Amino acid sequence: MNKIFTDQGFKDFLYWQYQDKKTFKKILDLLKDIDRNGYKCKGKPEPLKGELSGWWSVRIDEKNRLVFRIENEIIEILKCDTH
């Protein structure tokens, strides 16, 4: 699947790339798993409610979450930081 980022999602992605290689690798691993398994990926995927209805959240670590959705074989990343 192709991946696209919102502006905030891309800023978060770049932040982790330069600030914390371990967290960045975890994000890359999650994206690969989402690509293979969709919403049945690792990281305890949960559908979000309210204004983020339609988006899903998976755990990067205890504090941070990757928020994404899949539409038409495209993974859209909203953010990768604190939930």
Describe the role of every protein-language-model region.
Residues N2-I4, K11-K25, W56-R65, R69-H83:
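Enriched for short, Lys/Arg-rich terminal
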Residues G9-F10, K44:
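A short alpha-helix capping/helix-coil boundary motif
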Residues W16, L31-I34:
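Alpha-helix boundary/capping residues
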Residues F24-K32:
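PIN-domain endoribonuclease scaffold, especially VapC-family toxins
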Residues D33-V58:
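A short, surface-exposed loop/turn module that caps and links secondary-structure elements
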